[in-house]
Amino acid sequence: MKNVCLVTRIATVILIGFGGASVDAQDLPTTGSFETRIGRLELENGYPNAATVEKVFDDIDYQRACQAYLWALPLMAMQQWQNEHLTKFDAGKCDYVDYLTFQDKLGLLTANATTPYIMAFPNLKETGPLVFEIPAGPTAGGFTDFWQRPITDSGQTGPDKGAGGKYLILGPDDPDMKPEGYYVFRSPTVNIWSAHRALDPDAAKARALIAGLKIYPYSKRENPPATRHVSPSGRKWSGTQPRGLAYWEGLAKIINEEPVHERDRMVMGMLQPLGIEKGKPFTPTARQKKILDEAARTGELMARTIAYEKRFEGSSVWPGKHWDISLFLKETNQEAPHHTQFDERSSWFYEAVGVSTGMMGRTVGFGQLYLETAKDSEGNWLSGSQAYHLNVPKDAPVAQFWSVTVYDNETRCFVDTGVQPDRSSRDDIVKNADGSVDLYFGPSAPVGKPKSNWIQTLPGKGWFSYFRLYGPTQAYFDRSWVLPDIERVK
């Protein structure tokens, strides 16, 4: 119920916020007019006139749609990717798509360019309970529902702890079962995401790990069918949430496949006057289309602002620097003690996909950490037309490796220059005599600097960067190691 209370509170604030300042009921004229951010509103004998009624309802629906856009971001990322999986790659819902190169990952929100991804999007209503075989070895990942809430980690940060095993995932309405030899979990949603990374730096060993990932129905466990692995190579695709009316068309479709959870009931009620209702087709009127289209644009700008200008207390990593913790959720289920982390959730799921315990980077030497910046040392937005420099000090606090990646601030995918969009400590990069590394960013290679240390950007495009720590060590947690800001080269 705490989630319902939160949404109720948000809705109340929205609905009373027409004026620049708060307006009490007694301040409304019995007969007369007053200015608001949506124009002049008029009352006659305490009632809104016809023009005011129309304005108020339009604004109610518009404001609700903007907030619903933010609410739906994690769900719509999954729906979009599942659709691309089926239509662009000709993969079945129980097939894995293996994203091995940076070109394969060009449509993926804030992907890392270093390790292979292996992804599937099963529908448990269609298959019944599913078995997922995880091979022994260095893998990371797990399973989430379609709201991107973790069902369980697998691999090194999962219950198998890197030893491999069989995971049995039940759907929302499947009967309980606990067969011996399986890690058993239940998904709150019908559609799920099976997401894994092969972490072995040896390419042959990584391929063997990928081949060891299997999916099949529990009902066919005695004679399981072979798992198909599909390559996305050479196919253009996009995991970016749809824009405009397509966002709402996708939302209307997916909510008709999924159960409504308690925390979402209030938002579902807010969507009903906009023509989006479970159990009914989405046939919006011209008025609804206009409001939804505008709200999708404004909602995305809200998400972009929340993501790139983070105002979360404690998200800044080092005083005076512009590096923030990108995945700034207290818990993987997106809940804080007294509220759902609505803005933090919007920030992360606008930029990225997936949450797991391992991605929170809270255990010394294990998991990953995601540090982010969209600004240079002077606080200016990063521009693809400018040249920049970053010094990575020696002894980076990682048990495995670090990487720096550049992303397009509109698509949140790799800056698509046709060349590798990242550099990592695994690469053949030039180090300084003191062990530090100088990296360069810009539309052209820096004169007199090692090209191996340069990441290309696109003129006229904004970009942001993730600095990833794989297996963060104590020097990060005690902040004794400090990453400088990216500096513009003048």
Q: Which residue ranges define each predicted feature?
A:
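Bacterial N-terminal signal peptides
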Residues: 8-19
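N-terminal secretory signal peptides that target proteins for export/translocation
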Residues: 1-7
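A compositional/structural signature for long, glycine/proline-rich flexible linkers
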Residues: 23-490
